[in-house]
A protein has these predicted regions:
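RNA-binding accessory domains that recognize and position tRNA/RNA substrates
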Residues: 1-52, 56-59, 63, 68-70, ...
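A generic "binding-loop/recognition-motif" signal
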Residues: 12, 80, 320-321
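Gly/Ala-rich beta-loop-alpha elbow adjacent to hydrolase catalytic centers
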Residues: 76, 80, 85
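Short, well-ordered beta-to-alpha junction loops that form the rim of enzyme active sites
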Residues: 163, 317-321
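Short beta-strand-loop/turn "lid" adjacent to the catalytic site in phosphate-handling enzymes
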Residues: 320-329
Length: 501
């Protein structure tokens, strides 16, 4: 069988997952490993090629030379090229991180740049410089006075580019990445969600047999896709527990039950624990305490219900690839509150463990799930409890649910729901003076939050048209008597976070 996996050695940096996502977008499977992964770990993936990328400037970083003895193509990007040069006997330097767009001139006759423009713009660290090339390397591109902006040793199949094709996402930059994958590494573009679903369903059937699987279903994208995929494999042997803690958005709990129980035919157990959660949250104002109480209470409810069901062999959870990259251990901060401590399972099933968020959404569509579930807005595990500043009460939840529903409805009506990555309402703990029916009022202030982002590590506040904001505000203050003022949050992340609590 032909090698099909690309190993990416990560040098660190805030955007370390971008190159992996670009490779996956080319329908090629890749694994992200730390730059100092031992050679046997790399060999275990039987890679068709290796990419070295990252943006952390550290002159102390070194590479294991045996990487270049694996007889597979290697591509260094940005700092990755500098590291290749230093490791193989050349000289390279970098002063700081000053990334700017620059005009790049390339040798379009080389297979790495085949089909790309001779001149194009790319992001590059202006202070990065290759002073002396290693033996038998040649230059393929130049940037201003830097003649070694891309290098190659075709005999070793080792290449480097100082610029970052993963940032541009233009026709030229993607062409360069595809040339490395398809012309040099000779992989095939066979990594699709249809391919993944077929293979995973087959392997899970063989692994599980007639044993039972329990899934904690929150209704979020990850747990929902996880449940549907597992059900496709084992049918009625899957049991999903949905804990309705009363902190969801308007009609959300009913929609989750309708789809999974009525339409999908999954063994679905909805547990009404609204009063239980509200009682635990009574008098609590600190956001961290709210989060811990909700997480702990979820676990208690989950444990109680799981023990009523009887013997369960496996637990399924919606861990996704970014979770795995953040920690070498099983994630304990799953969107349903964490793994139960004292329920024994033979194993954990994580069907989405190798997928990025966009791949999870694509898998959901491939499995026939409706867009409204697949493209559901990101929603914090503690739900509306952390979108109510201060103590959580049923009255406040009802107010926020209605206001949030109006905001989401108006955003959807004007077609902005696919352009804005996250948008929601926050019920503040402030009141203001207002006028209604010629009488003085003293009611709640509601804040609206909307952001655009690619990775949720940073975000820009969304420039929603004033006419839309005006309509949202007018509807909220007219339809919800408990609110008499609406404000819009225009703060980026950083310095703010996306959520208020």
């Amino acid at each position: 069988m032909e090698r099909q996996t690309i190993v990416i050695l990560d040098l660190g940096g805030p955007n370390n997952q971008i190159i992996a996502r670009r490779v996956r977008e080319c329908n090629v499977y890749c694994e992200l490993l730390p730059f100092d992964a031992d050679i046997q770990t790399i060999k275990n993936f039987d890679p068709a090629g290796i990419i070295i990328a990252g943006s952390v400037n550290d002159r102390q970083i070194t590479l294991d030379k045996s990487i270049f003895e694996l007889q597979v193509p290697v591509l260094g990007i940005g700092q990755g090229q500098l590291l290749i040069v230093r490791t193989l006997g050349g000289k390279a330097s970098v002063q700081d991180s000053k990334y700017q767009k620059a005009q790049i001139t390339v040798d379009s006759t080389h297979s790495l740049f085949e089909g790309a423009s001779i001149n194009f713009e790319g992001w590059v660290n202006q202070s990065a410089k290759v002073d002396t090339l290693p033996l038998d390397f040649c230059s393929l591109a130049s940037i201003k006075q830097n003649k070694n902006a891309a290098i190659a040793n075709d005999k070793l199949k080792v290449y480097g580019v100082l610029f970052h094709p993963e940032y541009n996402n233009t026709q030229d930059s993607i062409k360069i990445l595809k040339n490395f994958l398809f012309n040099i590494c000779k992989v095939s573009p066979n990594w699709t969600m249809s391919f993944y679903a077929r293979n995973y369903i087959k392997s899970l059937r063989e692994k599980i047999g007639d044993k039972k699987v329990l899934c904690a279903l929150s209704g979020g994208v990850d747990s929902s896709v996880c449940a549907v995929l597992v059900q496709k494999a084992i049918g009625d042997n899957l049991v999903c527990i949905f804990v309705d803690h009363g902190l969801l958005r308007k009609n959300e709990a009913d929609e989750v039950e309708k789809y999974f129980k009525d339409q999908q035919g999954i063994n679905f157990l909805r547990v009404n624990a609204q009063d239980r959660f509200l009682n635990r949250l009574k008098g609590i104002r600190d956001p961290e305490k709210k989060r811990k109480i909700i997480g702990e209470e979820f676990i208690r409810v989950f444990e109680e219900q799981a023990q009523k069901i009887g013997e369960i062999d496996y637990l399924a959870q919606g861990t996704i690839y970014p979770d795995v990259l953040e920690s070498a251990n099983v994630k304990s901060h799953h969107n349903v509150g964490g793994l139960p401590k004292n329920i024994k399972f033979k194993g954990i099933i994580e069907p989405l463990r190798s997928l990025f968020k966009d791949e999870v959404r694509q898998l959901g569509l491939t499995l026939g799930m409706p867009e409204r579930l697949v493209f559901r807005q990101p929603f914090p595990g503690p739900g509306l409890a952390v979108r109510i500043i201060g103590e959580v009460t049923k009255q406040k939840l009802d107010i926020l649910r209605e206001a949030d529903a109006i905001f989401r409805e108006e955003i959807s009506l004007v077609g902005l729901d696919k352009n804005i990555n996250q948008y929601f309402a926050v019920l503040t703990d402030m009141r203001s003076v207002g006028v209604r029916d010629e009488e003085r009022t003293y009611e709640n202030i509601l804040a609206l939050r909307a952001v655009t982002t690619t990775d949720f590590m940073s975000a820009k506040w969304a420039k929603i048209p004033h006419s839309v904001l005006e309509r949202v505000s007018s509807r909220i203050v007219n339809e919800i008597k408990a609110i008499n003022r609406v404000v819009y949050d225009i703060t980026d992340k950083p310095p703010a976070t996306i959520e208020w609590e």
